[in-house]
């Protein structure tokens, strides 16, 4: 059986990257929440 996690940096950046987050209102909310919490890393 194939494992479910098949890592790809391109797919990772496209779905969870900074620019992907900033592209939508909800994504910007995610960034804001993570900044407010004081996360060292905001995005993948």
Curated annotation (Swiss-Prot):
Q: Which domain of life is it from?
A: Bacteria
- Membrane spanning segments where? none
Any one biological process term the GO annotation gives: translation
The molecular function terms in GO held by this entry are: structural constituent of ribosome
Give the PROSITE patterns listed for this entry.
RIBOSOMAL_L34
The alphabetized UniProt keywords are:
Ribonucleoprotein, Ribosomal protein
Q: What Gene3D superfamilies does UniProt report for this protein, alphabetically?
A: 1.10.287.3980
Pfam families with a match to the protein in the record: Ribosomal_L34
Q: Hey, which family's this protein in?
A: Belongs to the bacterial ribosomal protein bL34 family.
Protein's UniProt name: Large ribosomal subunit protein bL34
Q: Which organism is it from?
A: Pseudoalteromonas atlantica (strain T6c / ATCC BAA-1087)
From the broadest rank down, the organism's phylogenetic lineage runs: Bacteria, Pseudomonadati, Pseudomonadota, Gammaproteobacteria, Alteromonadales
């Amino acid at each position: 059986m194939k494992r479910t996690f098949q890592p790809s940096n391109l797919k990772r950046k496209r779905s969870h990257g900074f620019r992907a987050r900033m592209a939508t209102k909800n994504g910007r909310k995610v960034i804001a929440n993570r900044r407010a919490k004081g996360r060292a890393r905001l995005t993948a």
